[in-house]
């Protein structure tokens, strides 16, 4: 029996596609290797720990019938239309390795005639006369026994619409050394005129099969033909809910934000009588777990620099691999509230 599984979605509904992804990830055998290919109609997809009101122009999105979808991985906000091809690779540990899935995508692009390379923490770029241009962005998620890598390839996306719905973080733009979103991305059609979603999916599928030395039949799925996934209706209801995608607007009396080399951080505090009655953390960090834990620790504590710093440093026990990030965060918070 093959250890591979290939699913291709005929749906353009971001909530359906992300719910399928979540279901498969939760329920797949640890020995299985999964490739899921999909695309979304007009959607802003935000990272698990992001604040949609800061990241998106929600008024313009509503006017233009652009959906908001919160994914379960970290990272930043992106705009999807039918000019994007989305891919998700899943595998159990210890086999899960994002460098393998990255190489599969690079091999697929090479087979199509595009020479691309990995750049930074989550991008694929091509070299042009104007410099490196991004053609793909990715995000990742890991649990104790499995992981996934998902991302998008820009085929023929309407790049002019990016600025309509995304509010660029000025500190992020400065940190990346760029002047505009449009200047740093390009479509694959600029390199391969006429390239289609179907051709890209076929190339990725062939590279996936070639890497593992196996082939399987594709499962074509849609809302009318859902895969056999227990609890899919429940997960779809959550994925499409306002509570998941927007949540409650943060009520705060003090806002702190900063951009570090590893991502942006925004802290929202409500403070009453010197105590933090509510703490929220939003971030586009690819590993938001320590920051999510920090929010819980700050709840109910004193709004004092030394106490906040102490709570940051206490997280080093649970997140030793993020020592650099936590120490930078601790120093910044202490200085910001003094």
Swiss-Prot record:
Metabolic or biological pathway, per its Swiss-Prot or TrEMBL entry: Protein modification; protein lipoylation via exogenous pathway; protein N(6)-(lipoyl)lysine from lipoate: step 1/2; Protein modification; protein lipoylation via exogenous pathway; protein N(6)-(lipoyl)lysine from lipoate: step 2/2
Domain annotation BPL/LPL catalytic: ranges: 29-216
Record Pfam families: Lip_prot_lig_C, LplA-B_cat
Record PROSITE patterns: BPL_LPL_CATALYTIC
One GO CC annotation: cytosol
Residues given in the record as (R)-lipoate binding sites: 134
Binding site for ATP: 71, 76-79, 134
Compartment(s) where it occurs, according to its Swiss-Prot or TrEMBL record: Cytoplasm
Keywords carried by this UniProt record: ATP-binding, Cytoplasm, Ligase, Nucleotide-binding
A biological process term (GO) from this entry: protein modification process
Record-listed E.C. numbers: 6.3.1.20
Enzyme class: ligase
The reaction(s) this protein catalyses: L-lysyl-[lipoyl-carrier protein] + (R)-lipoate + ATP = N(6)-[(R)-lipoyl]-L-lysyl-[lipoyl-carrier protein] + AMP + diphosphate + H(+)
GO molecular function: ATP binding; lipoate-protein ligase activity; lipoyltransferase activity
Family to which the UniProt record says this protein belongs: Belongs to the LplA family.
HAMAP family cross-referenced by the UniProt entry: LplA
Leftover remarks: In the transfer reaction, the free carboxyl group of lipoic acid is attached via an amide linkage to the epsilon-amino group of a specific lysine residue of lipoyl domains of lipoate-dependent enzymes.
Quaternary organization: Monomer.
PANTHER family xrefs: LIPOATE-PROTEIN LIGASE, LIPOYLTRANSFERASE 1, MITOCHONDRIAL
Purpose of the protein: Catalyzes both the ATP-dependent activation of exogenously supplied lipoate to lipoyl-AMP and the transfer of the activated lipoyl onto the lipoyl domains of lipoate-dependent enzymes.
Identification of the protein by name: Lipoate-protein ligase A
